[in-house]
């Protein structure tokens, strides 16, 4: 199947400006296409991945992706999908975010080779345009009536929208025009909320370059979970690509915990597995759901893609240790990842009796309860049961002098940081 057929099979196409024309174009030649992201933060989350996974598929099919980091538009604020004005960021913060997002993109895409990925920053071609040029050369080509009719603006008319955010669609249209004339970009990809901005770009190109210009837009559906909620959030909030914000273990666990009703859809959306392999896994979901093979494959594919093979192996190791209770096999760094969301306590490195220590930390409510739990075999330290109420807790019990793991009962883990 060609790239458009594959995208449609994967359920990744929402709207196209000219399906027949785009299909014919990609069958005739390899094209350049672009997708942009504004540096509103210093990391993307998994919701941002959706259009860039499509870009990656085009790249693997031999087409040339152009990734735009919005160093200019990021200082303005995209009103799409928002009910209120964005808080403007300083140029210094925007530049910091640009650098961080650029580094993330370089990890996700291969640079060099037959299908080289280009990174561009729209600040480079917009910062020297003065207000007169903006109004004469670009603003003249936009009708206020059509701008007001765009969903991204119409939805804000009751609550209010600033002139700054109102003109965002002009800036994004300028991006498409610039990339069309300078990089021969013929296709823009975006989320479903970007349809109005994308069509503004098509209109501008045709007005400035002629109606025969072959340019296209394609949007991706809003991805919802089976319960109707928006994809991309965990119980702890957004799932980030930055390992400092969401550890590779947490990232892996997010995908492992995918609902059976969603997992096949996610395999199509996010992985590069073949149709045959995904069909096999879909059968396993129906016939052997308890094995969660599809979820494990999804988690492995996504963790390796975003964080690399080594981080995947570490996440799998932590998962296995937590399931089996074999905590001693983990390193201190792995403990830090695996127990990040567990109840955490702080302790000195001073040697203490286990009973006194558990009560002082607040893990046990009283000495009597602590002794009772120890005598009943309900307390484990670093994966080994504590059977003697006279046991001393020393720094030698810790992982690299940093952590001690206490388990009370079967599942109640606590992380104790020494310092």
Curated annotation (Swiss-Prot):
Function: Catalyzes the attachment of tyrosine to tRNA(Tyr) in a two-step reaction: tyrosine is first activated by ATP to form Tyr-AMP and then transferred to the acceptor end of tRNA(Tyr).
One BP annotation, GO: tyrosyl-tRNA aminoacylation
GO molecular function, a single term: RNA binding
Motif, 'KMSKS' region: chain positions: 230-234
GO cellular-component term (any): cytosol
Record bears the keyword Ligase: yes
PANTHER family tied to this protein: TYROSINE--TRNA LIGASE, MITOCHONDRIAL, TYROSYL-TRNA SYNTHETASE
Intervals of motif 'HIGH' region: 39-48
Protein's organism: Bacillus thuringiensis subsp. konkukian (strain 97-27)
Swiss-Prot/TrEMBL keywords: Aminoacyl-tRNA synthetase, ATP-binding, Cytoplasm, Ligase, Nucleotide-binding, Protein biosynthesis, RNA-binding
Major location (coarse): cytoplasm
Name of this chain's protein: Tyrosine--tRNA ligase 2
Residues involved in ATP binding: 233
InterPro entries per record: aa-tRNA-synth_I_CS (IPR001412), aa-tRNA-synth_Ic (IPR002305), Rossmann-like_a/b/a_fold (IPR014729), S4_RNA-bd (IPR002942), S4_RNA-bd_sf (IPR036986), SYY-like_C (IPR054608), Tyr-tRNA-ligase (IPR002307), Tyr-tRNA-ligase_bac-type (IPR024088)
Domain S4 RNA-binding as annotated: residue spans: 352-418
């Amino acid at each position: 199947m060609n790239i458009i057929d594959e995208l449609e099979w994967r359920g990744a196409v929402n709207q196209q400006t000219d399906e027949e024309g785009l299909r014919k174009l990609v069958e005739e030649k390899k094209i350049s296409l672009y997708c942009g992201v504004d540096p509103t933060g210093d990391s993307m989350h998994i919701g941002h991945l959706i259009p860039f996974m499509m870009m990656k598929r085009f790249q693997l099919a031999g087409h040339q992706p152009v990734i735009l980091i919005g160093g200019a538009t990021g200082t303005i604020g995209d009103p799409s999908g928002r009910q209120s004005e964005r808080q403007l960021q300083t140029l210094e913060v925007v530049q910091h975010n640009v650098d961080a997002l650029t580094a993330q993109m370089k990890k996700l895409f291969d640079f060099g080779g037959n299908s080289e990925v280009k990174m561009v920053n729209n600040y480079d071609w917009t910062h020297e345009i003065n207000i007169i040029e903006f109004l004469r050369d670009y603003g003249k080509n936009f009708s206020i009536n059509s701008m007001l009719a765009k969903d991204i603006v119409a939805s804000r008319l009751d609550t209010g929208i600033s002139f700054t955010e109102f003109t965002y669609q002009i800036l994004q249209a300028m991006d498409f025009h610039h990339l069309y004339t300078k990089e021969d970009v013929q296709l823009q990809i975006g989320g479903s909320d970007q349809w109005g901005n994308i069509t503004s770009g098509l209109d501008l190109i045709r007005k400035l370059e002629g109606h025969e210009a072959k340019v296209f837009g394609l949007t991706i559906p809003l991805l919802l979970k089976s319960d109707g909620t928006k994809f991309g959030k965990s119980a702890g909030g957004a799932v980030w690509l930055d390992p400092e914000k969401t550890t590779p273990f947490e990232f892996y666990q997010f995908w492992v915990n995918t609902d059976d009703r969603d997992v096949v859809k996610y395999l199509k959306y996010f992985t590069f597995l073949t149709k045959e392999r995904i069909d096999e896994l879909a059968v396993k979901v129906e016939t052997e759901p308890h094995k969660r093979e599809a979820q494990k494959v999804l988690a492995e594919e996504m963790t390796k893609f975003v964080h690399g093979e080594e981080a995947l192996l570490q996440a799998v190791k932590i998962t296995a240790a937590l399931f089996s209770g074999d905590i001693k096999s983990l390193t201190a760094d792995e403990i830090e990842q695996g127990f990040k969301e567990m109840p955490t306590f702080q302790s000195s490195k001073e040697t203490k009796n286990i009973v006194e220590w558990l009560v002082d930390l607040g893990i046990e409510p009283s000495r009597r309860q602590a002794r009772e739990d120890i005598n009943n075999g309900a307390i484990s330290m670093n994966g080994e049961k504590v059977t003697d109420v006279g046991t001393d807790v020393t720094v030698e019990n810790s992982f690299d002098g940093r952590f001690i793991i206490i388990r009370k009962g079967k599942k109640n883990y606590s992380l104790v940081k020494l310092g």
